Amino acid sequence: MPLYSGDKISIGKFVIGNPMPIVVTSVFYEDVSTFVERLQTKVLSDKNLYEIRFDMFTEREISDEEELISAMREMDIDYIFTYRGKDARKYYETAIRKMAPAVDIDMDLIGKLEAKPTVTKVIGSYHTSDSEAMMSALDRMIDSDVDMVKVACSYSEDQEFLGDLKRIIDIRKNRRKPIAYVPMGRTFWRALAGYYVSDIVYAMADRPTAYGQPPADYYYQAFKALFY
């Protein structure tokens, strides 16, 4: 596990808090059928934990979301459902009612969804380029009732990132809620955050869904060098 880790939680079959951070493969496609076909033909592994960026799909009606959730359940594939942007609430309500393994919701939606998760794990998240705003959001979400917290911040300088990494390490020493810390800017920063504090890290599949996102193999090689 990271040098400073949180309590264990499960997202489907995946236990967050194992010996190394879980590598989550972040994906989006034109439509659900394209994604499902790639899984069925083994272009994409059915052994991964996926983040499905449904807001980046071209075809993304509620009916498409329901088709996606049903297909993933039939294939027994675990995932984090993510939707950024307009009408996010209705997509998350659907995901929770249909018992998706996990959802990644913006901090502003915490406590505002009518559907109450019984199976679905809730990850509260906040994205910014303001370091102080990120730290404030981290404190607020750790104190909320979400299962896990994700904060992402854009950096241009090493010292900015290293300063925040130290502050998050200090927080992790006393507070046990699982955390994903995503420093956007340089790819190695993501691996370093995984080594020290992040219980999960995000990798690209065919193409990145966020700035500086590497393929999964990058993390495996970095962690091999750092952990052993």
From Swiss-Prot:
Per UniProt, where does 3-dehydroquinate bind? 26, 51-53, 84, 190, 209, 213
A GO molecular function annotation here is: 3-dehydroquinate dehydratase activity
The reaction(s) catalysed by this protein are: 3-dehydroquinate = 3-dehydroshikimate + H2O
GO terms for biological process? 3,4-dihydroxybenzoate biosynthetic process; amino acid biosynthetic process; aromatic amino acid family biosynthetic process; chorismate biosynthetic process
Alphabetized Gene3D superfamilies for the sequence: Aldolase class I
Q: Which InterPro entries match?
A: Aldolase_TIM, DHquinase_I, Type-I_3-dehydroquinase
Q: How does it assemble?
A: Homodimer.
Q: Which family does it belong to?
A: Belongs to the type-I 3-dehydroquinase family.
| Name of the protein | 3-dehydroquinate dehydratase
**Which species does this protein come from?**
Thermoplasma acidophilum (strain ATCC 25905 / DSM 1728 / JCM 9062 / NBRC 15155 / AMRC-C165)
